[in-house]
């Protein structure tokens, strides 16, 4: 993409055509300064406010009245005019004009058509349209800068033997959110149900002195009867805090509602989501059991689609569609492309799970995922390409015919039902045994048995007895109680239960353990029960497979109609029929994902309150007004994120935000720049805790991603030392001997005092040179099995100009740094591995180089004002963190910036010593040139 600002009458079109590419230009006309627009709003809404304050947007940011396309013959294209609402809404908000949007659009379209008839040049058309727009909207002329228009050129390579596809407008003005918000407001005025959006906007604050992470609460929420019947078939159970969150969210969203979970980096948010998905699927299996024959769940409808008849699916099966949404496209894609991987299930379940494998393999292959799949559990649908891909995969499945024995040794319906009932009975039986074990422990406690003084095993106690100190008995009383025949019988039964259940953690054992051990101790369950819950999910998937085979005719008919609907959402269709099609598709693929921006397109045919389960990932990054439409379509919403990681990016200035709040009386928590969807969902969740001055939803506290010092830096920066680092296998895997440079020397701050530091330059070339040197050494010193591969690392900076400078340095030195590695491979790796902190939310690497840059206090203060940016940067690293920068510039506040001092005397390393640390090898040491 090439952007040209046109300030004169000189023709901006390229003089020579590139035959290897097809190119199309779009002319953005009616250019207006965003700074001027901000000032106009502030003056209108809050005239007493100083609109010249420094946080107003930069001078070089513009908005536009609209755009049109220019053909290869340098003529405006008929029918290509797009009119933006921004300037119209600005005029409406400031009461500059009373013209309607329809009248305004018709005016510009008429002018455009008239100019086309006279064969006017594109620049003349742009000026005429701009004049008409500003006159019609009665906007002040000083909004118009010297730039007459902006020309955007977009190109695509021409592939040999294929017809060049027409380049479409990249929706320059296609922000869907204003239209969605207007429709939501209208629905509220019409008294329609708006799902979870109503709770988010109207419920009072639930903040209190309650602490969801305290021992009493954890033990209470881990009582056996609170556990879901099924879990994801992993070799490992959830941590107690994850399990508390899962138990509580199902208890609080039985029919509707919002539940928020606070997940710091590396605390297992994805793992938690997998358990939620497993339980929802297993709950649907309970409904499937009701049908003596799978065909009984379907009823033919009078009307159908262009592809034939459709069927109504029993309404009891409408409640299991799962949608995952986020502002972050990478987050939703990563989640829904991770769940189907065979690596995500435990080894003992590998041969038992093989759910619609052809469909699963097609879905992963469409997204260039080469990992083997266990089943078609999820798919990303968040843009048209993804929807077309999925529709194609489903169409191929229909063409293949009914899933047969080659797919999963499909059992007959009766056998599948019997196996599921047996698995469910096993779970129920083990839960009953746990309840009985708890009752026996209570009885033993009441009689004061199992005292150490009597020589028995350590006491079996409940949480209440441990807290109340009711075990203080004399030795004589203990011996007398232990000899009581009832208590002796209870002890025998307790021992028998332990032998059958396997590993069991009793409340007293949990309370007596140190925090690190406690973080992995699940109370209320056992090895046997965890295995049985996973087996139930396996049986549920087999039941679904058998159900699909038994009702393939109505299912395939509905799938044909679904593929038509999802590929062409503009064709509409009633919500009443859509829910039957979506519920049918959900039998095959239970989880779908989308960004908020595309959510309304994916679920265009479903109305408000129609999606049974919405899971929002990375909610701390999501602006509430972006998410509100998705919430309005959902019955239940699970909001997962972290207010101490990256915050939403807001294009609105603080001045306009303040003026807007003043004009319309907006409470602070609902203001655009005050928080995120996560903070609003946390606000109404009574099951939470206060951390770092903020009320958060159910906290996840067990960290498994990073080793030291990254864990302690993050824990101190953002979480008041509430997280616990456990089972750190990464530490044990550190290379030794000749392979010690595989991950590099210990984490450190490399103190670089750049001779070229300047207040107005963010990039310090000396810092970039050291970063490139380290990258080259890490690439050269990789273990033999990885020699020749580029290292698993990220180069991160708070500032875009620093990231661009490092990328430029690296590409200039690539032959010296990486030997014979192909330039396109290096370029792709650099694009993927070097960027700002905002590029890496949700990602991780073995090594992170945090290159700080900047020398002026104001920029540094911006990066450090909140813990969010540094918290995310530091926790991208699993094994090594190398901070590169001038610590004298960055250390500003002795309490806030204490992490910069490190935990050991070797943390601060001068630049020369840093190079020496990476040079202790007989290999060639490259000499890199600075790119200034």
PLM regions: where:
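ASCE P-loop NTPase helicase motor core
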Residues: 233-235, 239-397, 568-719
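Conserved helicase/translocase motor-coupling segment
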Residues: 717-811
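Extended, charged coiled-coil helical stalks used as long, distance-spanning scaffolds
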Residues: 395-511
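Helicase C-terminal subdomain and adjacent C-terminal extension
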Residues: 372-373, 653-698, 821, 857-932
